[in-house]
């Protein structure tokens, strides 16, 4: 399908309307490099005063005049036919000749022929015209311009090869952008593309026209866009625009062009613009436009780390750019799915520890920690560097479409060689993982010319071999230039957010190792949580390289999010050109907001998918702006509404008054859950912590001040200290050596923040986690939640502290708003000590309920109806339909929460020794299994039943606009079936409990069929 920009329909986002046709005659026009093209005679360029250059260099009395004259002539003769004389002053040329003389002197003394000169704003490099020498200098130049972090300054680079092909020179400069003027260059007036002073001076009108076109296309593109023109027979001009990265692309571009047999890069330039776009221009001899386009599309996907083994192999020519990009993705796969080394000792210990609580889990944790270095990507790269020929075989198998016979032959060849070389068993396992990658890929976009990231749809059955408790329905692996990601869903129709993980350097390695496991856990939790909606559980993750970004940057993060979206769309839009598809089935994906992907991101994703021509764009993302039909969770407190329903149900059962309870909360007033928990609760807040600060007041934190912060979404650091009682305190994360009112010295504010939920200042009746990293409380540290000396998680699990009084508990009630804040075993340990605990999958499902009903409206309403009824400027300025629909969603959230809570409580009253956590899991598992059974049955042949359930499920306000019979025509059949399966399963399980049997289900369905028949009359 032809790609369209998110803001408007365009034929293509590249420099030509479609992939280049070999028969297409390219016009002979001006290139970006020179005012016309490489001139055929010196007449096209101003005369260079050789005598003046010789005189100026000789005057420095460093080199003999004859040598100066000889090399000056060599220099001028080599470059005077290029645009070099146009771009440099006489003084600069003198410096360059001086550099050439220095390089020659080094060479005559037995050193390498090269010269490097750098100061604060300018740099000059010279070397032999040899691939490795040029790459070395290019890397230095790229590092030089990448050091500039001043947003008011831009960079320029120039690259020339002498006419006799003997030497190459590189120059770089850092300088201000021009003042803002009303020129046609500014395709986006709100963010003008101001060029550097050098670019403004050097670019001709034709070149500016090319640049304007690229800048315009870059506005709606999430990958590099380029323009290719033939400037003369056998000579091609290549111009590319991309979002400004921390590392300059010029090295990678040169390296991939050098792969083309007979091709030579003659000149190159790059200019940065004030709107964070970088322009690159190259003039290449001996290459066809098709060859250049093919390779240029991969430039943003090459490994970007200078000392990465794959980068070195590519630059040395041992691997092509296609092989390098492919094996980089295969290494990502291998990192997460290569089985951990096992030995007889491991198997023996596993058998012994199998009878101990949590024993095998602890053994596996120990194995993981001991094998981290061996299973690292660095080690994998080192092994690949020894056997690049294996990569070529594995890539060829992938390129041709992997076949079992070919994989077996390759595996035999690899195993034979590695045994000969006496390599470790793990090395053999690594290469087998690469072949496994080929085997499990059932859809990919590797062959697409236009792609923001690599996307692979994997057959998830291979996870059975890796001891995952449940095999997902679908797994996607994504490999971007500066990020990697996954998407996991446990059912065909599934829902979940996309989490963007941004790390400091010290945490990046840990996050990199755990990202798939975290994604899996979050998706599985979502599956259990989504028992009240048609969609099963899913989750997406985007892990950004810490060397690229270590804190949230909205522009860059949105750009990466849209790259993730673009790659996903490649695989779910039917009939996409260049996509290799062995799945042969249409998939529906729903993406919700999560950490670092809320705000404007969902709307951007929806509009982008609309621009790509995705029919279900209205439902593709949730959490969109109200103007696009989104129902923002934070504005209406959807998730909090569910959490509060559970808290109040507990108070009602235990006979407690909300206003008399003391509460502690993680997650501050600047977040969705944190702010709404503040605004919608009535307890006395005694402690709160967020990323910015730790706050405590035993008299109760001032409610009005908390409300002020929550309304304005401000972090705790903005809390006015004047609102604290004498015993209260506010410690900022960056504070050091702070003395608290009770005399305690806090040496490190960030450490206090991380441990605050364990300190005495957070003691309360109720704990509601509304933020924090997963597994903040585990079996290893949960003992700190007891006011008992030396309490530990293992003893808690064994029931040693089963008869504690409420005074011995740090918290008597815990309702998890944040996902996975407390590990499963820690939850059970707390309940065995008398804590009333409701886990995340039950408590915080309000958000997904809202998102699901938002999606359902998008599927039911036509585009015109959607714009009329679901487009709201704000919560107050919204259509009456929208307001009523939101209120009905809130009622549905509360209804679902009470249904599940009462089911959990009834089961617990039957056996008070059974943890509510395990009861909730049992109910969820039964629900999920019942849903799967219904989906695999022929129950949907009864159209009266389907119509009845759809009528029960749809909210009244929606049915007033779209009658049920119209819904049945518009909503996809598999989504209708998912609604029926969910509705039947959840109500059955909530009514009959964990121990119900087939006879109970028969009675239940008899009643449902009777109601359906009655409704059909």
Give, region by region, the residue ranges found by the protein language model.
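Non-transmembrane, aqueous-exposed alpha-helical and coiled segments at domain scale
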Residues: 550, 648-662, 679, 697-711, ...
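Glycine/serine-rich phosphate-binding loop and adjoining beta1-alpha1 elements at the start
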Residues: 485, 519-659
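Gly-rich Lys/Arg/Thr-decorated short loops/hinges at beta-loop-alpha junctions or inter-strand turns
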Residues: 234-236, 496-503, 616-632, 720-739, ...
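Hydrophobic, well-ordered beta-alpha structural blocks that scaffold small-molecule cofactor pockets
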Residues: 617, 627-706
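Terminal amphipathic helices with adjacent charged low-complexity linkers/tails
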Residues: 280-283, 551, 555-558, 584-585, ...
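Non-catalytic interaction/regulatory segments
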Residues: 25-33, 42-481, 486, 501-512, ...
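Conserved phosphate/anionic-ligand binding catalytic regions in large, soluble enzymes, centered on
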Residues: 468-496, 527-552, 591-600, 625-643, ...
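N-terminal mitochondrial targeting presequence
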Residues: 1-44
């Amino acid at each position: 399908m032809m790609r369209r920009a998110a803001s408007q329909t365009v034929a293509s986002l590249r420099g030509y309307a479609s992939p280049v046709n070999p028969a297409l005659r390219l016009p002979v026009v001006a290139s970006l490099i020179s005012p016309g093209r490489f001139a055929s005679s010196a007449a096209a360029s101003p005369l260079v005063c050789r005598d003046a250059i010789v005189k100026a260099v000789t005057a420095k009395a460093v080199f003999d005049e004859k040598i100066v004259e000889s090399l000056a002539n060599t220099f001028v003769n080599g470059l005077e036919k290029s645009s070099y004389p146009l771009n440099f002053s006489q003084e600069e040329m003198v410096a360059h000749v001086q550099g050439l003389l220095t390089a020659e002197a080094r060479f005559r003394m037995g050193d390498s022929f090269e010269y490097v000169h750098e100061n604060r704003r300018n740099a000059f490099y010279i070397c032999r015209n040899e691939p490795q020498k040029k790459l070395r200098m290019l890397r230095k130049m790229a590092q030089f311009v990448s050091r500039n972090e001043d947003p008011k300054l831009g960079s320029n680079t120039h690259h020339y090869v002498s006419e006799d092909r003997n030497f190459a020179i590189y120059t770089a400069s850092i300088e201000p952008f021009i003042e803002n003027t009303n020129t046609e260059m500014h395709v986006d007036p709100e963010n003008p593309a101001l060029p550097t002073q050098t670019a403004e001076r050097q670019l001709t009108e034709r070149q500016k026209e090319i640049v304007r076109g690229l800048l315009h296309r870059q506005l709606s593109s999430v990958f590099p866009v380029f323009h290719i023109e033939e400037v003369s027979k056998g000579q091609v001009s290549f111009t590319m625009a991309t979002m400004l990265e921390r590392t300059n692309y010029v090295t990678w571009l040169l390296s991939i062009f050098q792969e083309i047999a007979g091709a030579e890069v003659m000149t190159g330039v790059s200019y940065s613009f004030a709107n964070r776009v970088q322009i690159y221009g190259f003039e290449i001899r001996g290459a066809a436009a098709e060859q250049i386009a093919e390779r240029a599309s991969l430039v943003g996907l090459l490994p970007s780390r200078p000392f990465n083994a794959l980068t070195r192999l590519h630059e040395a020519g041992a691997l092509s750019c296609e092989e390098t990009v492919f094996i980089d993705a295969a290494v990502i796969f291998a990192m997460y799915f290569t089985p951990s080394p096992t030995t007889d000792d491991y198997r023996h210990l596993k058998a012994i520890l199998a009878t101990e609580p949590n024993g095998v889990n602890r053994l596996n944790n120990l194995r993981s920690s001991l094998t981290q270095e061996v299973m690292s990507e660095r080690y994998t790269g080192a092994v690949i560097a020894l056997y690049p020929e294996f990569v070529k075989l594995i890539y060829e198998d992938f390129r041709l479409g992997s076949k079992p016979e070919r994989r077996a032959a390759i595996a035999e060849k690899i195993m034979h060689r590695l045994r000969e070389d006496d390599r470790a068993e793990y090395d053999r396992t690594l290469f087998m993982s690469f072949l496994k990658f080929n085997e499990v890929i059932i859809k990919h976009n590797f062959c697409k010319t236009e792609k923001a990231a690599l996307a692979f749809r994997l057959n998830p059955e291979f996870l059975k071999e890796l001891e995952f408790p449940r095999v997902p329905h679908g797994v996607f692996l994504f490999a971007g230039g500066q990020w990697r990601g996954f998407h996991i869903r446990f059912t065909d129709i599934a829902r979940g957010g996309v989490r963007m993980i941004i790390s400091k350097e010290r945490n990046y390695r840990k996050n990199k190792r755990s990202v798939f496991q975290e994604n899996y856990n979050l998706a599985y939790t979502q599956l259990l949580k989504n028992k009240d909606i048609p969609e099963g559980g899913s989750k997406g993750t985007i892990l950004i390289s810490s060397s690229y970004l270590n804190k949230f940057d909205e522009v860059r993060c949105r750009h990466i999010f849209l790259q993730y979206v673009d790659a996903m769309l490649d695989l779910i839009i039917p009939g996409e050109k260049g996509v290799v598809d062995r799945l042969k089935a249409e998939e529906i994906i729903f993406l919700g907001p999560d950490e670092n992907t809320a705000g404007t991101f969902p709307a951007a994703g929806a509009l982008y998918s609309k621009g790509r021509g995705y029919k279900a764009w209205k439902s593709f993302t949730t959490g969109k702006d109200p103007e696009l039909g989104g129902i923002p969770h934070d504005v209406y407190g959807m998730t909090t509404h569910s959490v509060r329903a559970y808290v109040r149900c507990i108070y009602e059962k235990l006979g407690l008054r909300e206003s008399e309870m003391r509460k502690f909360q993680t997650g501050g007033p600047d977040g969705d859950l944190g702010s709404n928990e503040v605004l919608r609760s009535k307890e006395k807040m005694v402690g709160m912590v967020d990323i910015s600060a730790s706050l405590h007041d035993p008299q109760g934190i001032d409610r009005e001040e908390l409300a002020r912060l929550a309304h304005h979404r401000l972090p705790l650091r903005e809390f006015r200290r004047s609102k604290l009682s004498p015993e209260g305190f506010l410690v900022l994360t960056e504070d050091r050596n702070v003395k608290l009112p009770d005399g305690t010295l806090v040496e490190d504010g960030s450490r206090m923040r991380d441990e605050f939920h364990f300190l005495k200042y957070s003691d309360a009746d109720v704990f509601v986690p509304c933020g924090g990293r997963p597994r903040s409380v585990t079996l290893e540290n949960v003992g700190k939640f007891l006011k008992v000396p030396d309490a530990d998680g293992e003893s808690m699990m064994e029931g040693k502290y089963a008869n504690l009084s409420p005074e011995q508990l740090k918290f008597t009630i815990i309702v998890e708003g944040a996902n996975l804040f407390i590990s499963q075993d820690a939850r059970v340990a707390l309940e065995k000590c008398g804590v009333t605990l409701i886990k995340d999958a039950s408590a915080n499902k309000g958000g997904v309920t809202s998102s699901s009903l938002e999606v359902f409206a998008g599927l039911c309403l036509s585009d015109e109806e959607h714009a009329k009824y679901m487009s709201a400027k704000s919560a107050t300025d919204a259509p009456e339909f929208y307001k009523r629909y939101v209120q009905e969603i809130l009622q549905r959230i509360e209804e679902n929460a009470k249904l599940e809570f009462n089911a959990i409580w009834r089961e617990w009253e039957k056996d008070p020794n059974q943890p509510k956590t395990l009861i909730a899991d049992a109910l969820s598992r039964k629900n999920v299994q019942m849903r799967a059974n219904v989906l695999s049955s022929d129950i949907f042949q009864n159209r009266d039943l389907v119509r009845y359930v759809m009528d029960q499920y749809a909210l009244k306000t929606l049915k007033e606009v779209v009658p049920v019979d119209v819904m049945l025509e518009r909503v996809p059949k598999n989504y209708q079936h998912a609604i029926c399966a969910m509705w039947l399963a959840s109500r059955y399980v909530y009514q009959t409990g964990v121990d119900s049997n087939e006879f109970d289900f028969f009675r239940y369905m008899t009643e449902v069929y009777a109601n359906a028949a009655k409704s059909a009359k």
